[in-house]
Amino acid sequence: MTSKTESTKKRRLSICMVTDFFYPNIGGVESHVYNNSQCLILRGHKVVVVTHQYGNRNGVRYLAGGLKVYYVPAPLIVGQASLPTFFSTFLIFRNIFIREKVQIVHGHQAFSTFCHEAILHARSMGLKTVFTDHSLLGFADASGILLNKLLKFTLSDVGHIICVSHTSKENTVLRAALDPKIVSAIPNAIVAEHFMPKPKGMVLDKDSEKWVTVIVLSRLVYRKGMDLLVVSIPRICKTFKNVRFIIGGEGPKRVDLEQMREKYALQDRVELLGKISASQVRGILIRGDIFLNTSLTEAFCIGIVEAASCGLMVVSTKVGGIPEVLPKHMLEFAKPEEDDIVNALGKTIYKVIARKSKLAEKSKTLVSSNKTLDKPKFKISDKDFADSDSESNDYMSPHSFHNQVKNMYSWHNIAYRTETVYYKVIRIPEPPLIERLRLYYGCGRVAGKLFCMVAVVDFLLCFLFELLFPASEIEVAPEFSIEKYNKVSFLFFFPI
C-alpha cells in the first residue's frame, strides 16, 4: 500500500490551468496562475494555460520556462470575462485536453466563464478537476445570489477546492454549501526578489525627502473602495502640506478622482498614472513611504504583500482575509469608513515623519501642536512613536520588512501544497453519471433540474464528438523539455 502511494506521489502530472484572467492583463489572479504554474513546471509537471484572447494576442504562445498558453478567440463581456455559451467551447477545450494529455483541469476565479465551462466539459470527459476561489462574495445582492447558484452547480462535482485565505474558505463553503473537508486554504505569494526595497541613499525625485508619498495601486472600481479614497484625499492634503498621492490603475472611478483633483486644486499633489504593467509595480512602490488599500471586500490582497516587501508601511481596511496576510506591526488597520481611514493614515504619516527624521519626540510635538485636522482626532500612543524609530527598532526598517515577507511567502511552498491537492484528487475514484446527476439535482428545486439537463446535454455532446472526431485521430502535442530549454538559454547568453 505504501509503495503504491509513493509511486502515485512521484507521478508527473499534466495540468491545465483555465481562467479568463491572465497576462497581459495584471492582477492577483493573473500573478497567481503564472507563478504557480512556473513553480509546478520546476517540480517536474507539465502545465498549460487556457484563457481568452487579449487584443491581437491569440493562438498558442510560449512564456518563460516553457509555459504554454492557449489564447482562445471568444467574445467578451464586462470585466474581461468571456461571454457564457455553455456548449460552444466544448470542442476546442476537448481538443486541447486531448492534445496535451491533460489529467487535471484547474479553474481559477468564480467570475471566470472559461473556468466554469472548462470544469463542466472536463467532468463530462472523466478528467479530475480543482477550483481556486480568489474572491469574497455577499449573499444579499442579485448578482451575488446568481453567481452563488452557478458556483454551487460547478463545485458540486469538483474534486477539491482551494481558497486563498481562511476567511475566503468560510465564505466559499457557505456560498456553495460545501463539505469543509474538500476545501483547503492556500494563500497567494510573491517573488520577493522582484520587490526589493529602495537602496539606501538612492534618490528617485529631487524633492522626495520633503514629501511623504502615499501609493495606491488598484483597479479604480467601487469594490476597491475608490469612493472612500475620493473623500479621504482632500482631508489628508488639507492637514498635511507635505503629503502627496500616486495612484496607479484604471477603472470607472478614475473620473471621480480627476473631478476631486480639479475641485480641490490638487494637481501637484495627486498623480494619476493610469494603467500600469507588472514590470512597473516595483518602480512605483519604491517612490512611496505608505501603501494605502481601501478595499470594501478582499479575499487576500497581494498588493499589500508587495508593498511590505518593498519596505512601505501599509494602511488597509480591515475586511475579508486581509488580517491574515501580514503581522500587526507591518500595517495599520482601519474600518471601511471615511473617518477611520483618515485617522489611520494620519497616524501612519506621523510614523513616517518620525522614521525619516529619526526624531520621534519632535514628531510627537508636531502632533500635539497640530490644530488644523478636522474630526476625528488622532489617537497616537507612546508605543506608536517608539515603533516608528527605526534606529532602535530594526524590525521596522524597510529591509527588515522585506526579509520578513520573504520568509513568510514563497511560490515554491505554494506549488508544493497545490501539488499535494493534485495527488489527493487524482486518487479519487470516478463516479458514474447517475451520481453526478444526483449531486446537481440537489442544487435547488428548479435550478437542480436545469443543471441536470445541462450536464446530460454536455455528456451527450462528449459522446457525439467522440464519434465524429475520435480522440485517437487528434494529434498529441510534442513534449516541451525544460532541461533542453535551460541548456539552450544558457548557451544563448553564455556562448562557448
What is each model feature region?
Residues 1-57, 61, 65-71, 388, ...:
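N-terminal subdomain of nucleotide-sugar transferases
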Residues 275-276, 283-288:
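Short alpha-helical donor nucleotide-sugar binding micro-motif in glycosyltransferases
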Residues 296:
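Aromatic "clamp/platform" in nucleotide-sugar-dependent glycosyltransferases that forms part
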